[in-house]
Regions:
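N-terminal pre-domain/capping segments
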Residues: 1-94, 109, 116, 120, ...
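Acidic/histidine-rich catalytic cores of soluble enzymes
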Residues: 21, 30-31, 121-225, 276
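Active-site groove signature of glycoside hydrolases
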Residues: 88-109, 134-144
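A short, acidic, amphipathic alpha-helical segment used as a generic capping/interface helix at domain edges
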Residues: 224-237
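Short beta-strand segments at enzyme active-site cores
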Residues: 33, 60-61, 94-100, 132-137, ...
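Active-site beta-loop-alpha junctions enriched in small/polar residues
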Residues: 8-10, 34-38, 63-66, 101-103, ...
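Surface-exposed, active-site-proximal loop segments in enzymatic domains
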Residues: 64-80, 100-114, 212-219, 254-258
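Active-site clefts of carbohydrate-active enzymes
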Residues: 205-210, 217-219, 241-255
């Protein structure tokens, strides 16, 4: 498996080149960032050269379209999706991800119908660039009632929804935090096939009852109570060999420097991967 970073949890990084250098110096394999913005700043050849210089891959981009709101906003975002997909492909990226909130103010059946069609269109656009779409189920209990109506928050419901979307390039963004807050087990992971997983996020949780864990209160791998060695061992067992990327959402910005935080990430990754026998 390939060890990756997002900017989330790494403090006040000044620019993408600093992010790439920090990740490379700490021995990571990939970063997730905005491919279109990088190309706009450095040019296509300059952006490619940056990844080559730092011996990194672009793991995933975020889905840059508002698929949860009204139809006008969705349609207006389609050109940006095409541009983002083209930029990602130029940098060798084959993954694009979005999250699915576990509740909604819209009537859930109608929202499901709209979202299914919209995400199918997104998958078709991405597929033209040979990019996969990862859907992230979101587990923390407090978000299940943050809006009026319950929606989807389990892995199985998300897999069923992926089947309904019906495009071969759609799969899971599997986040260890949401695996934990759904009280899922290693056995649940071992039932997956590697092709069902588009991307993986790694982080840890404070020692709290599962129904009290907040989405934006995450900690670094190896510093909490999630069975990350079991999580990683199960992924390895089913044959998943792709990106495992840190994402640390916190209620306030870290006070440590980006250099210190990346080293903290490196230490945490080494700890949990070693404990998983990897």
């Amino acid at each position: 498996m390939l060890k990756g970073l997002t900017r989330a949890g790494l403090g006040a990084i000044e620019n993408d080149e600093q992010f790439l250098k920090l990740a490379s110096d700490a021995g990571f394999d990939s970063v997730d960032l905005n491919a279109k913005a990088l190309i706009e700043q450095y040019g296509q050849e300059g952006a490619i050269e940056l990844f080559q210089r730092y011996n990194l891959q672009l793991g995933s981009i975020d889905l840059p379209i508002e698929w949860r709101a009204d139809e006008e906003a969705f349609l207006a975002g389609l050109p940006a999706l095409t541009e983002a997909a083209a930029a990602a492909r130029k940098l060798g990226c084959t993954r694009c991800c979005t999250y699915v909130l576990p509740s909604t103010d819209q009537m859930p059946a109608h929202f499901m119908a709209l979202a299914t069609r919209r995400l199918r269109i997104c998958a078709q656009v991405l597929g033209a660039y040979r990019i996969r779409l990862g859907l992230e189920f979101v587990g923390p209990h407090h978000l299940r009632t943050a809006w009026k109506h319950p929606f989807i928050w389990t892995m199985q419901d998300t897999l069923d929804w992926i089947d309904a979307i019906g495009e071969p390039n759609v799969g899971l963004l599997l986040d260890a935090y949401h695996w934990h807050t759904n009280s899922l087990t290693v056995t649940d992971l071992e039932r997956l096939q590697p092709h069902q997983i588009v991307h993986v996020h790694l982080n840890d949780a404070k020692d709290l009852p599962v129904d009290q864990i907040l989405d934006n209160d995450r900690i670094y791998p190896g510093e909490g109570i999630i069975d990350l060695p079991g999580f990683l061992h199960a992924l390895n067992k089913i044959g998943y060999t792709d990106f495992v990327t840190q994402e640390i959402l916190t209620p306030s910005a870290p006070t440590e420097s980006p250099e210190e935080l990346v080293q903290r990430s490196k230490k945490g990754y080494a700890q949990v991967f070693s404990a998983a026998g990897l």
